[in-house]
Amino acid sequence: MNRLFVAYKPAGIGSNLFLSRIKREYKTKKAGFSGTLDPFAKGVLIIGMGSYTKLFRFLAKAPKVYRATLWLGAKSDTLDTEMIEEVEILEEFDEADVLKAIKSLEGSLEYEPPIFSAKQINGQRAYDLARAGVEFSLNKINSTIYETKLVSYCHPFVTFEAIVSEGTYIRSLGLIIANRLGVKNGSLSALERLSEGRFKYDNHKPLDIKKSLNMMQNFYHGDSDNLKYGRVLALNDLEIKSDGFYWLDSGSFISIIHVKDAKVNYELGRIEC
């Protein structure tokens, strides 16, 4: 079964366990997802089945839109509600100051990712080391925060939305907001992914893969059997000859090619659609 669609993961379940449920529902063994959501988070998860599991890196998955609720003063190494150690009682802030702290995130942002993350250190996941009590530090990363919005402020909870680049840690954004308000600790009490690029939840409606790819369509004017059997393609037979990734339409299937230095290579061949 080849299928590409957007599912909605509920809070309280890991992405892999949720995928197992999807596999059972659709009676398939081969399926995957793009963009892991933490167990406490909910929201959209792109699901691919069959040969469509190969398409994830070619999908238009950015920017991503999140809605989060920050608990000011809540201390947790996971930066969510999983390991709350203590809660500082704080005086209420002026809403204008809260908005200013949120808007200050916009632009290019350098920050440390959470120690409870999937980042690897010498082949080990950071969250495994953190749970084992190993002390370590992570290199700072850069994210682009395109736009932020204050949704509501009901002290000590701040709900905000953020449009961000791929790989952004929203838990870290929450802590940064707290710090810029002069608060040492802050953890997310809720997190929802509203969309990944153009992908939003629509009751598992199958996606048109030709409209989901993050690249231009090219046109091949040579023998169609070359695409059918995965034979070498000549650059002169392509309508667009400049370097880049392209998809080619063969009616019942597509191929994804990479043009570089006047050579044409297959990235994916014969994906049925």
From Swiss-Prot:
GO molecular function, one term: tRNA pseudouridine(55) synthase activity
Keyword Isomerase belongs to the record: yes
Pfam families found in the cross-reference section: TruB_N (PF01509)
EC number: 5.4.99.25
GO biological process: mRNA pseudouridine synthesis; tRNA pseudouridine synthesis
Reaction it catalyzes: uridine(55) in tRNA = pseudouridine(55) in tRNA
Disulfide bonds, paired cysteine numbers: none
Catalytic residues (UniProt): D38 (nucleophile)
Keywords linked to the UniProt accession: Isomerase, tRNA processing
NCBIfam families xrefs: TruB (TIGR00431)
Protein family (similarity comment): Belongs to the pseudouridine synthase TruB family. Type 1 subfamily.
Function per UniProt: Responsible for synthesis of pseudouridine from uracil-55 in the psi GC loop of transfer RNAs.
UniProt-recorded name of the protein: tRNA pseudouridine synthase B
Source organism per UniProt: Sulfurimonas denitrificans (strain ATCC 33889 / DSM 1251)
Lineage of producing organism: Bacteria, Pseudomonadati, Campylobacterota, Epsilonproteobacteria, Campylobacterales
Gene that this polypeptide is encoded by: truB
